[in-house]
Amino acid sequence: MKTIKSPREFERVFSCGKRAYGSLICIRVAKTCEDGEARVAFVAPKRLGNAVVRNRCKRVLREAARIESLPVEGYDIILFATPQTHNASLQDVSRELQRLLGKVGIL
């Protein structure tokens, strides 16, 4: 799974991507210029808590993305953790991710 790293790539997804919000995850999706392998970023803002909490949230998001067979080719996807992500089960996060991907038109 390739990741989005540069600020320019994040900016492009924010400016021209679709977004969907859930209670456990927020998602931003933008179509890439080429049909290469999709890239994913996992974001846990500092307002969620200390490093232990943020890292757990990112691990749960990463595993949910793996279970849902992300990445989908031709897309850049940014997954944001919310305060409820820390206490949620992997199954709940995975279900929410699937619902949000359908909402933005990927699945």
Residue ranges of model-derived segments:
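Positively charged, solvent-exposed patches that mediate nucleic-acid binding
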Residues: 1-107
